[in-house]
């Protein structure tokens, strides 16, 4: 992927946006927008950033008007969203986390990391080292059986790896990318 290839441009008049309408966010369309002052780098410059804590359809938009007022908005992409509320029902929208940094992009990143560690990660491993795990996908793709997985687990254990994640192919008749996705019946072959 190209997730570390930052896309930057001048703040033009009118609207500029990043969005996804395919049911997910990803490294292709990430729910993040930042406005920076000219010359901003990792250590210097002002940053105003927004990150949507949601993995579905989204839109992040920046608008500069004729009076040089700038407005940033972010939320669920309304083009692909419909929610009918009945009397007395509630809808809790996903949250947007906003960060301001006067010390560049590095401080913005550290602020996000600290906030998410304190407020979003709900794990017993929030403040301690997480167990090391290995995923069998790159080693086996769809071609694995019990013996092959046990061999991987034994070798991994020698290196201090504590958990094996059995990836795609454990369910249904899933031995290629275009079949059985979502068939959660264990494939014992």
Predicted regions and their residues:
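N-terminal accessory beta-strand-rich subdomains and adjacent acidic, glycine-rich linkers
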Residues: 1-116
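Short, low-complexity, polar/charged sequence segments that are solvent-exposed and flexible
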Residues: 68-72, 113-119, 151-155, 184-185
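Long, charged amphipathic helices and adjacent flexible linkers at domain junctions
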Residues: 112-132
């Amino acid at each position: 992927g190209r997730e570390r290839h930052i896309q930057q441009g001048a703040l033009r008049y009118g609207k500029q946006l990043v969005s996804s309408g395919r049911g997910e966010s990803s490294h292709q369309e990430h729910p993040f927008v930042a406005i920076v002052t000219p010359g901003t780098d990792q250590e210097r410059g002002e940053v105003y950033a927004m990150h949507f804590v949601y993995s579905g359809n989204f839109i992040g938009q920046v608008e500069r008007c004729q009076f040089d007022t700038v407005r940033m908005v972010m939320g669920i992409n309304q083009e692909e969203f419909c929610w009918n509320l009945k009397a007395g029902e509630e809808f809790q929208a996903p949250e947007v986390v906003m960060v301001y940094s006067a010390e560049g992009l590095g401080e913005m990143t550290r602020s996000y990391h600290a906030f998410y560690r304190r407020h979003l990660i709900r794990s017993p491993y929030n403040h301690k080292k997480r167990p090391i795990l290995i995923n069998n996908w790159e080693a086996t793709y769809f071609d694995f059986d019990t013996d092959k997985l046990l061999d991987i687990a034994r070798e991994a254990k020698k290196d201090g790896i504590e958990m094996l994640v059995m990836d795609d192919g454990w369910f249904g008749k899933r031995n290629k990318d275009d079949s059985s996705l979502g068939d959660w019946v264990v494939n014992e072959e």
